[in-house]
Amino acid sequence: MFESTENPLWQRFILAVQEEVKPALGCTEPVSLALAAAVAAAELDGEVERVDAWVSPNLMKNGLGVTVPGTGMVGLPIAAALGALGGDASAGLEVLKNASSGAIADAKAMLAAGKVSVMLQEPCDDILFSRAKVYSGDAWACVTIVGGHTNIVRIETHTGVIFTQTESVQGEAQESPLSVLSKTSLEEILAFVNAVPFVSIRFILEAARLNGALSQEGLRGTWGLHIGATLQKQCARGLLADDLSTAILIRTSAASDARMGGATLPAMSNSGSGNQGITATVPVMVVAEHVGADDERLARALMLSHLSAIYIHHQLPRLSALCAATTAAMGAAAGMAWLMDGRYNTIAMAISSMIGDVSGMICDGASNSCAMKVSTSASAAWKAVLMALDDTAVTGNEGIVAHNVEQSISNLCALACHAMQQTDRQVIEIMASKAH
């Protein structure tokens, strides 16, 4: 199947990773709203005076408690204001990377003056929806993002509609890389990872550079819940073993600490999430260092991890009640297992054990506590790999795990897509009651 480096399936796999694994500064739900505000502001000639915004319940959930980088403030209003006043409309998920201290001060002043509002979009059939309407005198511009964190579907100003996205364009062309990926299998992904030329996937090493830098930053300071730094102290005190398992736990947690605490460093995201990118990257990096892997082996392991994470997550809603750090960690389990022995059965067993272990962990919004879930998921991934290396795994006789790993994944995703919808509504209701 893989005779040529020009194999079209390889190209689709690589494109899928390039589409879904991107740098992102700050939690991607507030950033999505910041991007809408920045694009709207770019359509205006005058000084921005006010911002009104509307978001879906799921985006509200993931924006209530997370720190916006550089501001020291949490929530969607500061993201909307800073996007409008200091955002780079052309930078996608890095929209806030060049925001100046002056723009941050102006954004805080705009909030204090009561000139920023963020409301629930009701009714709203879209899981991921953000709309920002930015005003300058009598002029205004409104930008709507739907379905993906950077997927702008409409731009309108006081002079009329200037852009609407047509859905038919991509369908008339060839099938999207994600659609192609969803119709393959973990075995085909593994075959690709083993055979693709290194030069074609070298780019994935940037994930190690960016997320490794976040991890180092998390260990330096008191970002977020500073789980990584705290566990490192406990390790030095002899309360935690100084071993590979602990290194995975500490370094992965630290990256998420910095990410959720508002560090002004980008994460390499996966499936629109910085924490998913961290979870799919850092554990694999730590194991690669332990086994002395060179750049090529690290790149192949990271490619397997990120592709597997995308493959699983694509079967889920973009945002749901299921914590997607768990599915990203299933990718990490695949990457770590590949580094340890490379066998498909080891990878499949590790993922099956993950599904039998951390399935059902809820997403209760983006916040500092995400780093707890990231650390739990990373630890579970390594535990599952250790079991698989000894030919032990949760079997198809137990719970939602099936005898086939592909069916196990389908069972997990069915839970998130159907049964957990009421869980999501309940979580949002609880969080909304706390906000009032």
Curated annotation (Swiss-Prot):
GO aspect biological process, one term: L-cysteine catabolic process to pyruvate
Pfam families: SDH_alpha
Spans traversing the lipid bilayer: none
An annotated Gene Ontology molecular function: L-cysteine desulfhydrase activity
Superkingdom of origin organism: Bacteria
Family per record: Belongs to the UPF0597 family.
HAMAP family according to UniProt: UPF0597
Stated name of the protein: UPF0597 protein CKO_04510
Protein source organism: Citrobacter koseri (strain ATCC BAA-895 / CDC 4225-83 / SGSC4696)
Highest classification ranks of the organism: Bacteria, Pseudomonadati, Pseudomonadota, Gammaproteobacteria, Enterobacterales
